[in-house]
Amino acid sequence: MDAVLADPALNGRHMVSPPAGHATMQVRNVHKKFGDFKVLQGLNIEFVDDAITTVMGPSGTGKSVLLKHLVGLLEPDEGEVIVFGQDIWKASEDERYELRKRFGVLFQDGALFGSMNIFDNVAFPLRKHTDMAESEIGDFVMTRLQEVGLDRSAHKLPTEVSGGMRKRAGFARGLIMNPDIVLFDEPDSGLDPVRTSLLCDLIQQMHEQHGGTYLLVTHNISAARSCSDYIGMIWQGQLVHYGAADDAFNSDDEFVRQFLAGESAGPLGMD
């Protein structure tokens, strides 16, 4: 059973303590606002190695903003973002650049270059950031494409394949530099339930094969439950629950119950 910690910032709520393990990323009391809109309000969360963690919460609650903080694309107004023991905003520009190489990122649409075929899209980071020979790049790229089931589509343009295939190509590109951390920003967006389930299976398979820290942001409750080792719930810019995946579905927190059950009754409204 996970220990439960009282946190005054949660206005009486409780949250499950972080999972045991080596923390690769830590967010400490992070605040971020855009204009007068406060997105993150003292967020504290950490992510451990060799696990798949999913962060969930309503639209506009700061999940994608969290990802941008972790990869160093946004600087917090207050607080610290620690990656591999280093505060990334106390690091130099060159050090942040090197840290980003340890990340793989899968965006909602795959973020592929439309003028490049699948092979060249996946090869792009290797050509940009390494001095590998083309023959070595070719072998490496085809291995990744085989892993995601796209080796026969390497020559096709993104417009010539399905949305699910574009996401798998983006996944292959995200893994091409052998990252220690992989971030997924709503990877199931636009996919039907079957393709979502298959993508979840692929994520688990690749994590089992390559290890590392995988962090997913999604609204898909069934995918979060089946794909994750841990689930964190964010509401109003704060962490309201964090623990083993099944624990979230047994939470006594009113918001967590409402969100995961998809019910209209509860503290979460239309605004």
Predicted feature residues:
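Conserved ABC ATPase signature
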Residues: 157-161, 165
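A short, proline-enriched helix->beta-strand linker immediately N-terminal to the Walker B motif
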Residues: 176-180
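Conserved ABC ATPase "signature" region
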Residues: 87, 134-152
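Catalytic Walker B motif of ABC-type/P-loop ATPase nucleotide-binding domains
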Residues: 182-185
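ABC ATPase NBD Q-loop/coupling interface
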Residues: 80-98
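Helix-to-loop junction immediately C-terminal to a conserved catalytic motif
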Residues: 71
